[in-house]
């Protein structure tokens, strides 16, 4: 993966990431669990999150996942674990590393993120010095509770899966499933940031207007067609000033990292309200994200060339770039599992419903960032972009129940004898994501879980 770094008069940094010593697949950590081949968090990953000891009621702290542990960054900084790195000195870094959210660290930009990753890699390696002091900076993940990684000021959800858009379009417009703008412009809408929660979120079945097919007028009550959406979340790092455009060659330098995202949806509410402005109450009640943010630098060895079908319109010039063609896609395997209330009561494991891969996305991370700002819209550190439901080309790769059940016509038989068309009260949905390549370690995102509770009476 190529790297170019330059600074303009507006202090924007253009950067794609070079492989470096932190990507060495031979690296091992003194945290033994990080060396297990099935670990989501080997030393080559080092994702960021916000945590505290479960039940402590203390302030949240910034941490990095390593194996089944969390390294407390403020504690590590206090014992001078990051001494000797110019980018990691001074008041701005100290303030950022001691904050209860990642926003200030996100705002410091790629030179600081990369230097911090290098410093972390070196102090966590098997041959690192001062192990006794660093061991006191660890907390088992099993003893932690999490908050949102950042204070999310704005949330925009996109619609980047051609396969999802086509499948859903066929349900409502069989003769014209894909609207004419889809292959030209990344479709997005502004979502609700206040109801985004971290993994483990529980929320009540929303109540709203719907219009059943046989009814002459709408009715008010609990939504009946509850669904999940399998998505990738994109956290913005450094923002841009109002009026400035983030070009394609700058876009990924403004991305702090990726997470998993479940965009819960009430399909019957959505069907009634979405015209002409799109979903509102159908989606604003809850969105759940994973606690760990995986940096683009960690994902660098797992990039792929991005291709657009020759028969399709090619991106307009502002959405195209040589680096996009060379390595614009991310090979991230995604998975959805369901655990019903009965499964939990019986001690049964969750059942996998589908898998897909982010590499099949029609639009890339860089294109979303550039398109979002091309009219001068400013992004801020901690802003969140959703990829939209990630479905693959095969029916079993659908990222929502709406697709898997063909709009509620085809029931899913679960292994314990239960059936599902849409989610029922007590259902827990689990999303997982990881990337893996021959000769390289597994880089995981952990998981994001959420549980649907009954509507308020």
Model-predicted segments: where are they?
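Compositionally biased, intrinsically disordered low-complexity segments enriched
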Residues: 1-13
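Active-site microenvironments in enzyme catalytic cores
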Residues: 21-53, 65, 72-355, 362-366
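Residue-level marker of beta-strand positions
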Residues: 62, 69-70, 231, 384, ...
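Conserved phosphate/anionic-ligand binding catalytic regions in large, soluble enzymes, centered on
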Residues: 154-161, 378, 383-387
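Active-site pocket scaffolds in enzymes
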Residues: 362-371, 381, 385-434, 441-451
């Amino acid at each position: 993966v190529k790297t170019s770094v330059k600074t303009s008069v507006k202090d924007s940094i253009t950067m794609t990431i070079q492989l470096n010593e932190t990507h060495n697949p031979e690296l091992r950590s003194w945290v033994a669990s990080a060396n297990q081949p099935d670990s989501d968090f080997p030393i080559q990953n080092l994702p960021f999150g916000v945590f505290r000891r479960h039940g402590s009621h203390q302030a949240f702290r910034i941490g990095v996942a390593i194996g089944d542990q969390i390294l407390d960054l403020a504690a590590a900084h206090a014992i001078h674990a990051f001494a000797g790195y110019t980018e990691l000195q001074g008041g701005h870094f100290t303030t950022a590393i001691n904050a209860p959210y990642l926003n200030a660290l996100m705002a410091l930009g790629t030179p600081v993120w990369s230097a911090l990753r290098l410093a972390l890699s070196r102090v966590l390696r098997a041959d690192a010095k001062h192990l006794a002091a660093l061991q006191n900076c660890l907390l088992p993940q099993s003893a932690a509770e999490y908050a949102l990684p950042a204070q999310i000021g704005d949330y925009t959800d996109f619609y980047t899966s051609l396969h999802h858009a086509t499948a859903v379009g066929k349900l409502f417009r069989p003769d014209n499933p894909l609207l004419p703008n889809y292959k030209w412009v990344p479709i997005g809408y502004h979502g609700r940031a206040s109801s985004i929660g971290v993994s483990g979120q529980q929320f009540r079945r929303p109540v709203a207007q719907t219009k059943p097919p046989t009814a002459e007028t709408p009715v008010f009550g609990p939504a009946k067609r509850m669904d999940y959406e399998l998505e990738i979340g994109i956290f913005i790092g450094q923002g841009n000033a109002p009026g400035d455009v983030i070009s394609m060659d700058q876009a990924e330098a403004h991305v702090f990292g990726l997470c998993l995202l479940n965009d819960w949806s009430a399909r019957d509410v959505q069907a009634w309200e979405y015209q002409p402005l799109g979903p509102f109450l159908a989606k604003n009640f809850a969105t759940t994200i994973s606690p760990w943010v995986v940096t683009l630098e960690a994902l660098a060895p797992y990039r792929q060339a991005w291709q657009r079908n020759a028969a399709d319109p090619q991106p307009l010039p502002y959405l195209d770039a040589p680096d996009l063609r060379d390595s614009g896609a991310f090979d991230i395997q995604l998975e959805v599992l369901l655990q019903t209330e009965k499964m939990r009561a019986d001690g049964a494991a969750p059942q996998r419903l589908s898998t897909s891969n982010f590499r099949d996305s029609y639009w890339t991370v860089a294109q979303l960032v550039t398109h979002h700002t091309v009219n001068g819209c400013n992004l801020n550190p901690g802003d969140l972009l959703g990829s939209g439901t990630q479905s693959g080309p095969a029916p079993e790769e659908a990222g929502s129940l709406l697709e898997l059940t063909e709009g509620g016509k085809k029931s899913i038989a679960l292994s314990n004898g239960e059936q599902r068309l849409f989610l029922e009260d007590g259902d827990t949905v689990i999303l997982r994501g990881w990337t893996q390549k021959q000769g390289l370690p597994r880089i995981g995102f952990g998981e994001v879980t959420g549980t649907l509770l009954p509507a308020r009476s």
